């Protein structure tokens, strides 16, 4: 209605999803309204260098800097969603069961790939053990079938996850399993753990 064209370049790490999106968009939209370009990092770098009216990017800070430099060449306004940390604050008056259920849902829905997915919780020390148990209960209740959860998108991300958990454990954290994969789960599935 506003005459704004959308040109989408999805992540090269999700090539099957990108291809599916491209097929759907081509079927339901005219290319003058919405189009999709797929490809690797070379395509992404070229894409960001085009003179858009506005550019949105979601990804890492390192790639975000490259996108911003490329967009600056044409003074293209840019919106960067570079992640960060989303805390969940659970004060001593909170209903721990409700808080745990909300946090587990927020973290695990869509494979945790939402910009507001909680990354950590700040909980009063006197409530910590009870809260951890409520998180376990909520995880097992909401996601009783581990096959419903999303695995790592590729081997690099799977290795990164294992490295982050091991680094935390090496520094004194305790890894508390919340959901354990079943035998039928894809090899890319990582146990859902609380650190």
Residue ranges and their predicted role:
Residues 1-98:
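Rossmann-like NAD(P) dinucleotide-binding subdomain of oxidoreductase/dehydrogenase enzymes
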Residues 29, 62-195:
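ALDH superfamily catalytic-core signature
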């Amino acid at each position: 209605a506003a005459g704004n064209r959308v040109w989408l370049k999805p992540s090269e790490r999700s090539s099957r999803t990108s291809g599916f999106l491209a097929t759907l968009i081509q079927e339901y939209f005219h290319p003058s309204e919405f189009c999709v370009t797929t490809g690797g990092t070379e395509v992404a770098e070229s894409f960001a260098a085009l003179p858009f009216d506005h550019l949105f990017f979601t990804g890492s800070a390192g790639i975000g800097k490259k996108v911003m430099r490329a967009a600056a060449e044409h003074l293209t306004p840019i919106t960067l969603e570079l992640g960060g940390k989303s805390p969940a604050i659970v004060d001593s008056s909170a209903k721990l069961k409700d808080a745990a259920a909300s946090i587990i849902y927020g973290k695990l829905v869509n494979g945790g790939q939402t910009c507001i997915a909680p990354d950590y919780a700040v909980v009063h020390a006197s409530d910590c053990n009870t809260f951890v148990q409520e998180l376990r209960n909520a995880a097992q209740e909401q996601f009783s079938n581990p096959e419903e959860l999303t695995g790592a998108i590729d081997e690099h991300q799977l290795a990164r996850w294992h490295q982050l958990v091991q680094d935390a454990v090496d520094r004194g954290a305790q890894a508390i399993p919340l959901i354990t994969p079943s035998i039928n789960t894809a090899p890319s599935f990582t146990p859902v753990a609380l650190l």
